[in-house]
Amino acid sequence: MGLEDEQKMLTESGDPEEEEEEEEELVDPLTTVREQCEQLEKCVKARERLELYDEHVSSRSHTEEDCTEELFDFLHAKDHCVAHKLFNNLK
């Protein structure tokens, strides 16, 4: 193999940086579906209840209350929506 052959192989193989630019940026479908589900009325209401209760609990200096129930309600509403939509988006 001569010097010319080596140079030809280097130019034909392409630059790895160019190949990376040509590839599409992959987007996680789970993230996309979660964002869509958070916009639904049921999730919006659950988030509003969570934020309202969080403000209530945070305003008190000494309290044993927490927002666990409201957090679980919000996550349940969002996950319920995601479960129905996610697999339709997979290839």
Swiss-Prot record:
Residues 14-27 have a biased composition (Acidic residues). Residues 1-13 form a transit peptide. Its main location: mitochondrion. Gene3D superfamilies: Ubiquinol-cytochrome C reductase hinge domain. Residues 1-30 are annotated as: Disordered. The modification N6-acetyllysine is found at K42, K85. Keywords: Acetylation, Disulfide bond, Electron transport, Membrane, Mitochondrion, Mitochondrion inner membrane, Respiratory chain, Transit peptide, Transport. Disulfide bonds join C37-C81. It holds the Pfam family UCR_hinge. InterPro entries: Cyt_b-c1_6, Ubol_cytC_Rdtase_hinge_dom, Ubol_cytC_Rdtase_hinge_dom_sf. It is found in: Mitochondrion inner membrane. May be a component of the ubiquinol-cytochrome c reductase complex (complex III or cytochrome b-c1 complex), which is part of the mitochondrial respiratory chain. This protein may mediate formation of the complex between cytochromes c and c1. This is Cytochrome b-c1 complex subunit 6-like, mitochondrial. The lineage of its organism: Eukaryota, Metazoa, Chordata, Craniata, Vertebrata.
